[in-house]
Structures are given as structure tokens and as C-alpha cells.
Amino acid sequence: MRSLNDNLPLILDPTRLKTTLDNIPKAPGCYLMKDNEDNIIYIGKSINLNSRVKSYFRRRNDNNPKNSLMLKQVSLIDFIVTDNELEALNLESNLIKSNQPHYNILLKDDKKYPYLCITWSEDYPRILIVRRRRNRADKDRYYGPYVDVTSLRNTLFLIKKIFPLRQRQRPLYKDKTCLNYSIGRCPGVCQKIISSSDYRTVIKKVEMIIQGRTSELKKLLEEKMHIYSKEMKYEEALKIKNQLSGLNTFSQTQKITEPDSSINRDVIAHASNDSNTSIQLFQIRAGKLIARLAFTADSIKTNKENIIQKVIEEHYSQLDPVVIPKEILLDNQIEKIEVISEWLSEMKGSKVNIKIPKISKKANMVSLVKKNAELELTKLSKGVEKANLALEELAELLDLPFKPRRIEGYDISHIQGSDAVGSQVVFVEGMPAKHHYRKFIIKDETIKLGHSDDYLSIYELITRRFSRWSKYKEKGVNLSDIRNYKSSILDPSTLADFPDLVMIDGGKGQLNIALKALEKLNLSEDIKLCSLAKKNEDIFIPGNNKPLKCNNDDNGLLLLRRLRDEAHRFAVTFHRKRRTLGMRRTELTEIPGIGPKRIKALLLHFNSVQAIKMARKEEIASAPGVGRELAEHIWNYFNK
């Protein structure tokens, strides 16, 4: 276990920093930067590990916002040596995929643009339009993010007309098929009329359409149709003929961009300002534009000249190699173009060319993509300007010495003291940073059904949130040295950073109890505090018994209201979830012989009590820790 000193950033411990740097070899490989909780926050590669890692700690890098932000959190550096640079690139790609380090995730999780998800983690995969990746579903495959959601929905609609697909997450009926099966829209997934292996074969065909391999799929289907005809399986042959007809209709809906149907290429271009970068990627397959993808990157987190290379590494490392095109056109030169080309070629199994065209039709195509990126950046900048104005007005309203980049909001939720929980929501640069949100289960045993105490709950909440910083201060650490004054919306959630402002949902009483908690931690002078009462939307600050005066349309007040409402929503949602889970478990605990561990296993396996009630005996028996005898016992209980 590390000591408190070992948890300090290396830049604050010169002796440990020198020892760390001296032990890094002058060889190709990957380096892993970790924070004080052993979380990997950055993975890099280099042909000379020693030289590359040392470069982060040179004075001239102080002007690099991304590096200065990251180095405030690096407490440990590990390394892995490889034989050459290409091997280091492959290793880096695999490590990033498995660890998802914060500072390697260049592309923002922008929920404005949807993905198409194929749930390969399930026995019978579904095809969904989603705006965030599913948890605990590593085998799922994502395509996107797509700019044109209407076109995406139309594509999915046409695909479902060509191939019968699973329509529901759970069965509608327990012992009979639904209307979707009767009209041929579903192959009978719920009742397992089609086997998992046969259904997954259908999904693989659908995936070929999404990947732009429609011509290849047509050839496979034509060959299969001829085989069925020879074997006199005319009904099966007719099904394939109808699918081919549907594919021809689908192909006609795609925009032709190149007269040559053999052209498979991606065109990538970008536009940047000081805070954000917009990247557009056009996918052209068989001479047709099959998709227009859009990404947003944080300009602070990488050098603008390297941004396209980072996009290529991050985007293509997540793809099925068969999707990688033969040619990639860029708007800018990248540093390691030969190594990247070799890496992509090795992944694909055939040559991948990367070009930066200056004249000809290819250059015109790159210019078109760049115009789209510039338009998207303009839209993005307007949102940033609005958020900055709100922060400036809030700083003036609360008499803060600087704009509050990171603001935390806290709220409590319970019903007469039962299932009491707390929420922490975080706004960075005026925008929700949802991966920083935290949920708290109130542990004080005096708070229970019939005895609620919001003040005691807030006191516990604030104490638990800031106790680590109190320990640092007791140790003599200068908090201003490790405080993150350049908070970014993409800061890692493991960064226990001081907020520039803390807002409590409530009035003077709630504010005073939060202040007492900070005084107990010796942090009341370090953290700015306010509260926002629902009645009259009054703002209170320490040392002032009367609410601050401001207009109802003040941008600073509107920002605090959004934060307050979000903290309330997050707390109430968590409380309802805990209460519902308690009710679920109460129903299951009525079954004799079922303990807490088996209840948890059943709920994790089926997701709901309703699904358990509808399950067959053999399905219940497939849950972890549940055998045939217990499964029959459970089934009999629900089917008396």
C-alpha cells in the first residue's frame, strides 16, 4: 500500500521523480502514467522511452495545457519494452482498448450524434440506435457517430424490411408468439423458434450492409439462391430473391460520389479553435457515400498538428479490420504516416494507403469534408460562448475572484428517512460532466424510516467528499499546488479536485450545516460555498443572512438553477432505484430457501422480477448458483 507521499504527483516530489526517470530504458515501447489510485490515466508509445517521458517534465512543456493538467495527477510511471516502433503502436492500441485511459480518449462522448449498436454480447443480438455505450457489454460493436440521424433511421427501417430481426428486449408472451412473428417481421426469437447460431448468421449479413459491403453480400446471397434452386428448395430460394430485391432498392437510396464502383475510401478533415476541434469522416464504399461521421475533440488535450493522427489511431483501433478502407485521404500531413499506414495494413491484412491530396477530385472531396467540419465548429463555439457568459455573470454575482470552471451541486433524497441517499453533480465550464457525478448512500444509522434529518445527511455528504483534502492539508501539502485551476469537462472522474464553487440544494440552514462540515475539515477558507432555495429561487452565501439580489433572467442564476435541478434529479433517480430494488428483493425473499446472494444473482441475470416470473424452468436454472431443483421450486412459486 502506498504512503501519502507516494500518492503525491511526481512533479511535487523531485527525488522520486529523478529515480523514476533514471529507471526508464532508452528503448522502444509503451509508458503508462498512473494517478494516486493506480488508475492508468495515459498510455503513450515511443521509439525511445527515456527521452519521451523526460520530455514531459522539461520547462518548455509548461505551456502545453494538456501536459500541465495531466502531470498534476501522475504519481507513478510504468513501462513495457518492445522490439520496434510498430510493435509499440500495436501494444499501445491494445492497452488503450482494454484500459480506456482518460487522456487517451481524445474524442468526446458527444451524445448529440447517435451510434448504431449490434449487441453481440447477447445470444440473440439486437440492432439499436444509441447515444452512449452500454456497460458490461464488451462484445457489442458500434458504428458511428452518425451526423444524419434521419438517414440512419431510414437505413435501419429498410434493413428490417429485408431481414426479419428481433424486435423486443424481452418476450411479450410467455408461451406463444406475437404479431411480429405472424407477419414475418421477427423469426421467433422470444420463443427460440430460430436457433442462436442461425440468427447470428442473419445479423452478420446485416452487419455487412452497415459496413458498406452490400455488393459482397449480394454475391453471397446469389450463390446461396442458386444452391437452393438446384436442391429444389424453392421456398428458401424465394426468400433470398426477395432479400436481393430489397438490397437493390436500398443501394439506390445511397448517394453516388464516385463513378468507379471499386472505390473504398475514408476522407477525414478537421477545423480547430483554442478549445475544440471538429472532425468529419466521410465513408465511401463501392463509390457511394454510406455514412458521414462526426467527432469532437478537446484542443487542450493534444497538439493541433497531431490531432488527425490521434483520431486515426483512436477511431480505427476500435473497428473490425474488414471495415478499414483501402485508402484514407487527409487534409493535413501527420508525423508518422508510414508507421500508421503499416499498422493499418497489418490490421486489415492488405495495403492501406494514406494520402494528402493537393489537386484533383480527391482534393475537392477533402475540401468538402473540411467545410462540414468548419460548420460544425461554428455551432459548437456558440454553445461555449453562452456558457462562458453565464460563468462570468455568476462570478460577479457571488463576488468570486475568478470564473468558477468546476461547480459541484449536492442534494439529499429520501421518503421519511428511508433509503436516504445523496448526490454530487458536476458542471465544468458550464456544462454537465456526467462521468464526475457521484452517488452517496447515507450511512448514519439514526437516519431511517420515521426519522429524517437533511442537515445530518448534508454534513455526512460534505465530510465524505472532502476528507481526503483535509488529510493532505494536515500533512502540510500546499493545496494550491495540486488544485486544478484549468478544469476541463473531460477531467478524469478519479481526480478528487477542489471545486471552484459548491452549491447546496436548500436554504440558509442547509448552507450553514455544509459550512460547519468544511470548518471541521479546516477547509472553509479554501472552498467557496452557496445554496439555492426552491422558494423564490433565493441564493445564500456564508456571512450573509439575506438572499442575494438578482434578476430572474440573470444567466448566473439560471446556471445555478440548472445545477440544482440536475442534483435533485440525480438524487431522486438514485433513491427510486434503491427503493425499487428493495421492493423487488422483498418479493423474492418471500420464496422459501432463497437467500440474498441468489436473489442478487437472479436479478443480475434476468434484470427484473417480471422476467423471472415469465422464464421457463431451464432458463431459471441457467442463472449462476441456481440448479434444476431450486429452479423448479422458484417456477412453482410463481406459477401456483
UniProtKB/Swiss-Prot annotation:
Biological role: The UvrABC repair system catalyzes the recognition and processing of DNA lesions. UvrC both incises the 5' and 3' sides of the lesion. The N-terminal half is responsible for the 3' incision and the C-terminal half is responsible for the 5' incision.
Pfam families from the UniProt entry: GIY-YIG, HHH_5, UVR, UvrC_RNaseH, UvrC_RNaseH_dom
GO cellular component entries: cytoplasm; excinuclease repair complex
Coiled-coil ranges (or none): none
Family stated for the protein in its record: Belongs to the UvrC family.
Keywords for the protein's UniProt record, in alphabetical order: Cytoplasm, DNA damage, DNA excision, DNA repair, Excision nuclease, SOS response
Protein encoded by which gene: uvrC
Recorded superkingdom: Bacteria
Protein name: UvrABC system protein C
Domain spans labelled GIY-YIG: 26-105
HAMAP family on file: UvrC (MF_00203)
Domain UVR: 215-250
GO terms of biological process kind: nucleotide-excision repair; SOS response
Subunit structure: Interacts with UvrB in an incision complex.
Localization, UniProt: Cytoplasm
PANTHER family: UVRABC SYSTEM PROTEIN C, UVRC/OXIDOREDUCTASE
Any one GO molecular function term: excinuclease ABC activity
InterPro entries: GIY-YIG_endonuc (IPR000305), GIY-YIG_endonuc_sf (IPR035901), GIY-YIG_UvrC_Cho (IPR047296), Hlx-hairpin-Hlx_DNA-bd_motif (IPR003583), RuvA_2-like (IPR010994), UVR_dom (IPR001943), UVR_dom_sf (IPR036876), UvrABC_protein_C (IPR050066)
